A protein has these predicted regions:
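Bacterial Sec-dependent N-terminal signal peptides
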Residues: 1-23
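N-terminal, active-site-proximal structural segment of metallo-dependent hydrolase catalytic domains
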Residues: 15-78, 89-97, 280
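Active-site-proximal beta-strand elements of phosphoester/diester hydrolases
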Residues: 23-35, 99, 111-116, 150-159
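Acidic/histidine-rich helix-loop elements
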Residues: 28-48, 94, 118-134, 160, ...
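Active-site environment of divalent metal-dependent phosphoester hydrolases
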Residues: 33-36, 67-73, 161-163, 194-202, ...
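Structured beta-strand-rich core segments of catalytic domains in phosphoester-bond hydrolases
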Residues: 61-151
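His/acidic metal-ligating clusters that form di-metal
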Residues: 135-157, 164-193, 198, 202-204
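Metal-dependent phosphoester-hydrolase catalytic domains
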Residues: 165, 176-187, 195-280
Length: 280
Protein backbone atom coordinates (compact mmCIF):
# COMPACT_ATOMS: atom_id res chain seq x y z
CA UNK A 1 0.00 0.00 0.00
CA UNK A 2 2.80 2.37 0.93
CA UNK A 3 4.54 1.64 -2.41
CA UNK A 4 1.33 2.45 -4.32
CA UNK A 5 0.92 5.74 -2.47
CA UNK A 6 4.56 6.61 -3.17
CA UNK A 7 4.10 5.91 -6.90
CA UNK A 8 0.91 7.97 -7.04
CA UNK A 9 2.66 10.85 -5.30
CA UNK A 10 5.57 10.64 -7.76
CA UNK A 11 3.18 10.69 -10.73
CA UNK A 12 1.31 13.71 -9.36
CA UNK A 13 4.60 15.51 -8.68
CA UNK A 14 5.86 14.83 -12.20
CA UNK A 15 2.59 16.01 -13.72
CA UNK A 16 2.58 19.21 -11.69
CA UNK A 17 6.17 19.95 -12.74
CA UNK A 18 5.36 19.47 -16.43
CA UNK A 19 2.28 21.71 -16.13
CA UNK A 20 4.16 24.45 -14.29
CA UNK A 21 4.68 27.55 -16.42
CA UNK A 22 8.24 28.62 -17.11
CA UNK A 23 9.20 32.24 -17.77
CA UNK A 24 12.30 32.73 -19.91
CA UNK A 25 13.95 35.60 -21.75
CA UNK A 26 14.92 34.66 -25.30
CA UNK A 27 16.74 36.78 -27.89
CA UNK A 28 18.12 36.92 -31.41
CA UNK A 29 21.23 38.94 -32.15
CA UNK A 30 23.20 39.41 -35.38
CA UNK A 31 26.55 40.48 -33.93
CA UNK A 32 28.30 41.34 -37.22
CA UNK A 33 31.31 39.27 -38.21
CA UNK A 34 34.78 40.30 -37.08
CA UNK A 35 35.76 42.72 -39.85
CA UNK A 36 38.77 44.97 -39.12
CA UNK A 37 37.45 47.43 -41.72
CA UNK A 38 34.52 48.21 -39.43
CA UNK A 39 36.66 50.57 -37.34
CA UNK A 40 35.63 52.18 -35.02
CA UNK A 41 32.98 49.46 -34.68
CA UNK A 42 35.19 46.41 -35.15
CA UNK A 43 34.64 43.39 -32.90
CA UNK A 44 37.54 44.19 -30.59
CA UNK A 45 35.91 47.50 -29.70
CA UNK A 46 32.45 45.97 -29.26
CA UNK A 47 32.87 42.56 -27.66
CA UNK A 48 32.84 43.61 -24.02
CA UNK A 49 29.95 45.99 -24.72
CA UNK A 50 28.01 43.11 -26.26
CA UNK A 51 28.79 40.78 -23.34
CA UNK A 52 27.79 43.42 -20.79
CA UNK A 53 24.51 43.98 -22.62
CA UNK A 54 23.73 40.24 -22.50
CA UNK A 55 24.56 40.08 -18.79
CA UNK A 56 22.44 43.14 -18.07
CA UNK A 57 19.48 41.75 -20.00
CA UNK A 58 19.82 38.33 -18.33
CA UNK A 59 18.92 36.31 -21.40
CA UNK A 60 18.19 32.66 -20.73
CA UNK A 61 18.70 31.72 -24.38
CA UNK A 62 19.94 33.71 -27.35
CA UNK A 63 20.73 32.94 -30.97
CA UNK A 64 23.64 34.64 -32.71
CA UNK A 65 24.30 35.25 -36.37
CA UNK A 66 27.55 35.99 -38.23
CA UNK A 67 29.94 35.16 -35.38
CA UNK A 68 33.24 33.68 -36.48
CA UNK A 69 35.14 31.12 -34.42
CA UNK A 70 37.18 33.71 -32.53
CA UNK A 71 33.96 35.57 -31.66
CA UNK A 72 32.32 32.33 -30.52
CA UNK A 73 35.27 31.70 -28.20
CA UNK A 74 35.24 35.31 -26.99
CA UNK A 75 31.57 35.04 -26.05
CA UNK A 76 32.13 31.83 -24.12
CA UNK A 77 35.03 33.43 -22.23
CA UNK A 78 33.16 36.67 -21.49
CA UNK A 79 29.93 34.89 -20.53
CA UNK A 80 30.92 32.07 -18.15
CA UNK A 81 27.29 31.35 -17.17
CA UNK A 82 26.48 30.39 -20.77
CA UNK A 83 27.20 27.38 -22.92
CA UNK A 84 27.30 27.78 -26.69
CA UNK A 85 26.55 25.19 -29.36
CA UNK A 86 27.30 25.58 -33.03
CA UNK A 87 29.78 25.07 -35.86
CA UNK A 88 31.22 27.11 -38.68
CA UNK A 89 29.10 26.84 -41.79
CA UNK A 90 31.95 26.27 -44.26
CA UNK A 91 33.35 23.00 -42.88
CA UNK A 92 31.11 21.99 -39.98
CA UNK A 93 33.91 22.78 -37.52
CA UNK A 94 35.54 26.19 -37.08
CA UNK A 95 35.54 27.76 -40.54
CA UNK A 96 32.95 30.31 -41.57
CA UNK A 97 30.11 31.98 -39.75
CA UNK A 98 28.28 30.30 -36.88
CA UNK A 99 24.54 30.44 -36.20
CA UNK A 100 25.16 29.53 -32.58
CA UNK A 101 22.70 28.96 -29.75
CA UNK A 102 23.76 30.11 -26.29
CA UNK A 103 21.88 29.09 -23.16
CA UNK A 104 22.29 29.84 -19.46
CA UNK A 105 23.64 26.59 -18.07
CA UNK A 106 22.23 27.41 -14.63
CA UNK A 107 18.74 27.36 -16.16
CA UNK A 108 18.89 24.76 -18.95
CA UNK A 109 20.62 21.53 -19.86
CA UNK A 110 21.13 20.66 -23.52
CA UNK A 111 19.87 17.13 -24.14
CA UNK A 112 20.89 17.17 -27.78
CA UNK A 113 22.05 19.63 -30.43
CA UNK A 114 23.10 19.79 -34.04
CA UNK A 115 23.47 21.79 -37.23
CA UNK A 116 21.97 21.25 -40.66
CA UNK A 117 22.67 22.98 -43.94
CA UNK A 118 19.96 24.97 -45.68
CA UNK A 119 20.12 23.03 -48.92
CA UNK A 120 18.56 20.16 -50.81
CA UNK A 121 20.73 17.84 -48.69
CA UNK A 122 20.77 19.20 -45.11
CA UNK A 123 23.53 16.76 -44.11
CA UNK A 124 25.94 17.92 -46.83
CA UNK A 125 28.53 20.02 -45.02
CA UNK A 126 29.35 23.31 -46.74
CA UNK A 127 26.69 22.90 -49.44
CA UNK A 128 24.93 25.95 -50.89
CA UNK A 129 21.23 25.36 -51.44
CA UNK A 130 18.90 26.20 -54.31
CA UNK A 131 19.70 29.72 -55.62
CA UNK A 132 21.66 30.88 -52.57
CA UNK A 133 24.93 32.75 -53.01
CA UNK A 134 26.33 31.77 -49.59
CA UNK A 135 26.45 28.61 -47.52
CA UNK A 136 23.69 28.84 -44.90
CA UNK A 137 22.93 26.78 -41.80
CA UNK A 138 20.59 26.35 -38.86
CA UNK A 139 21.78 25.23 -35.44
CA UNK A 140 19.41 23.70 -32.89
CA UNK A 141 19.44 22.58 -29.29
CA UNK A 142 16.91 20.48 -27.40
CA UNK A 143 16.87 22.17 -24.00
CA UNK A 144 15.51 20.92 -20.69
CA UNK A 145 14.55 23.41 -18.01
CA UNK A 146 16.40 22.32 -14.87
CA UNK A 147 13.75 23.30 -12.34
CA UNK A 148 10.72 21.80 -14.08
CA UNK A 149 11.99 19.30 -16.63
CA UNK A 150 10.17 21.08 -19.44
CA UNK A 151 11.56 20.52 -22.94
CA UNK A 152 11.86 23.33 -25.48
CA UNK A 153 13.67 23.41 -28.81
CA UNK A 154 15.88 26.32 -29.81
CA UNK A 155 16.53 26.80 -33.54
CA UNK A 156 18.71 29.61 -34.85
CA UNK A 157 19.49 30.53 -38.44
CA UNK A 158 20.69 33.11 -40.95
CA UNK A 159 18.97 33.02 -44.34
CA UNK A 160 20.56 33.84 -47.67
CA UNK A 161 20.33 37.50 -48.60
CA UNK A 162 19.80 36.95 -52.34
CA UNK A 163 18.15 33.65 -53.26
CA UNK A 164 14.38 33.89 -52.88
CA UNK A 165 13.89 30.21 -53.63
CA UNK A 166 16.48 29.40 -50.97
CA UNK A 167 14.70 31.65 -48.48
CA UNK A 168 11.35 29.92 -48.98
CA UNK A 169 12.82 26.41 -49.06
CA UNK A 170 14.81 27.17 -45.91
CA UNK A 171 11.55 27.99 -44.13
CA UNK A 172 10.01 24.68 -45.20
CA UNK A 173 13.13 22.74 -44.22
CA UNK A 174 13.30 24.29 -40.75
CA UNK A 175 9.63 23.54 -40.12
CA UNK A 176 10.23 19.89 -41.10
CA UNK A 177 13.23 19.68 -38.79
CA UNK A 178 11.33 21.10 -35.81
CA UNK A 179 8.59 18.51 -36.34
CA UNK A 180 11.15 15.71 -36.64
CA UNK A 181 13.11 16.64 -33.52
CA UNK A 182 10.51 17.74 -30.97
CA UNK A 183 7.13 17.03 -32.56
CA UNK A 184 4.45 19.06 -30.82
CA UNK A 185 6.66 20.23 -27.94
CA UNK A 186 7.42 23.97 -27.62
CA UNK A 187 9.96 25.47 -30.01
CA UNK A 188 11.47 28.90 -30.59
CA UNK A 189 12.98 29.91 -33.94
CA UNK A 190 15.34 32.89 -34.02
CA UNK A 191 17.42 34.43 -36.74
CA UNK A 192 18.38 37.01 -39.29
CA UNK A 193 16.04 36.04 -42.09
CA UNK A 194 17.19 38.74 -44.54
CA UNK A 195 13.53 39.34 -45.45
CA UNK A 196 10.67 41.46 -44.14
CA UNK A 197 7.24 40.31 -43.05
CA UNK A 198 6.01 40.95 -46.60
CA UNK A 199 8.13 38.17 -48.09
CA UNK A 200 7.16 34.69 -49.22
CA UNK A 201 9.76 33.15 -46.89
CA UNK A 202 8.22 34.90 -43.86
CA UNK A 203 4.68 33.98 -44.89
CA UNK A 204 5.74 30.37 -45.37
CA UNK A 205 6.71 30.30 -41.69
CA UNK A 206 3.57 31.91 -40.27
CA UNK A 207 0.99 30.34 -42.60
CA UNK A 208 2.25 26.76 -42.71
CA UNK A 209 0.04 24.04 -41.21
CA UNK A 210 2.74 23.69 -38.54
CA UNK A 211 2.08 27.07 -37.01
CA UNK A 212 4.84 29.40 -35.88
CA UNK A 213 3.87 32.84 -34.61
CA UNK A 214 5.80 36.09 -34.96
CA UNK A 215 6.55 36.88 -31.31
CA UNK A 216 6.64 40.63 -31.88
CA UNK A 217 3.16 40.60 -33.42
CA UNK A 218 1.48 38.43 -30.79
CA UNK A 219 3.21 39.91 -27.74
CA UNK A 220 1.08 41.40 -24.98
CA UNK A 221 3.51 44.31 -24.88
CA UNK A 222 6.02 45.63 -27.45
CA UNK A 223 8.67 48.31 -27.19
CA UNK A 224 11.81 49.63 -28.83
CA UNK A 225 12.68 50.24 -32.46
CA UNK A 226 10.54 49.22 -35.44
CA UNK A 227 13.58 47.94 -37.37
CA UNK A 228 16.59 45.74 -36.72
CA UNK A 229 19.13 46.50 -39.46
CA UNK A 230 20.72 49.96 -39.41
CA UNK A 231 24.22 49.33 -40.79
CA UNK A 232 26.03 50.88 -37.84
CA UNK A 233 23.58 53.78 -37.97
CA UNK A 234 24.46 54.50 -41.61
CA UNK A 235 21.22 53.36 -43.27
CA UNK A 236 18.71 56.13 -43.94
CA UNK A 237 16.11 55.93 -41.13
CA UNK A 238 13.35 55.83 -43.74
CA UNK A 239 14.87 52.73 -45.34
CA UNK A 240 15.51 50.65 -42.24
CA UNK A 241 13.59 47.39 -41.88
CA UNK A 242 12.97 44.54 -39.48
CA UNK A 243 14.64 41.44 -40.88
CA UNK A 244 15.43 39.68 -37.59
CA UNK A 245 12.66 37.71 -35.92
CA UNK A 246 11.68 35.46 -33.05
CA UNK A 247 8.99 32.88 -33.87
CA UNK A 248 7.25 30.67 -31.32
CA UNK A 249 4.94 27.67 -31.38
CA UNK A 250 1.36 28.38 -30.24
CA UNK A 251 1.68 26.88 -26.74
CA UNK A 252 4.18 29.65 -25.89
CA UNK A 253 2.78 32.93 -24.59
CA UNK A 254 4.70 36.09 -25.49
CA UNK A 255 4.57 38.56 -22.62
CA UNK A 256 6.90 41.22 -24.02
CA UNK A 257 8.96 41.76 -27.16
CA UNK A 258 11.48 44.53 -27.68
CA UNK A 259 13.90 45.54 -30.40
CA UNK A 260 16.67 47.24 -28.43
CA UNK A 261 17.30 50.63 -30.07
CA UNK A 262 20.84 51.47 -31.10
CA UNK A 263 22.88 53.96 -29.10
CA UNK A 264 25.02 55.89 -31.57
CA UNK A 265 27.89 56.43 -29.14
CA UNK A 266 27.99 52.75 -28.12
CA UNK A 267 26.80 50.60 -31.01
CA UNK A 268 26.43 46.90 -30.26
CA UNK A 269 26.32 45.78 -33.90
CA UNK A 270 24.97 46.76 -37.30
CA UNK A 271 21.72 45.07 -36.22
CA UNK A 272 19.57 45.74 -33.19
CA UNK A 273 18.93 42.63 -31.09
CA UNK A 274 15.35 41.54 -30.39
CA UNK A 275 14.48 39.98 -27.04
CA UNK A 276 11.28 38.40 -25.80
CA UNK A 277 9.85 37.40 -22.45
CA UNK A 278 8.12 34.06 -22.93
CA UNK A 279 5.84 31.89 -20.81
CA UNK A 280 6.23 28.24 -21.74
Amino acid sequence: MRKILFLLLAIVTMASCSEEKVNVRWATFNMRYDNPNDDPNHWGARKERVANYIKEMKFDVFGTQEVLHNQFEDLKALLPDYEGVGVGRDNGATEGEYSAVFYNKNVFDALDSGTFWLSEDPTAVGKMGWDAVCVRIATWAKLQHKATGKIVMAVNTHYDHVGQVAQKESSLLIIRKIKEIVGDQPAVLTGDFNVTDQSEAYNTIVSNEFVLLDAHKVAEKTSGASYTFHGFDKVDPEKRSKIDFVFVTPQIKVLHSEVTPEVKEALLSDHNPQWTDLEI
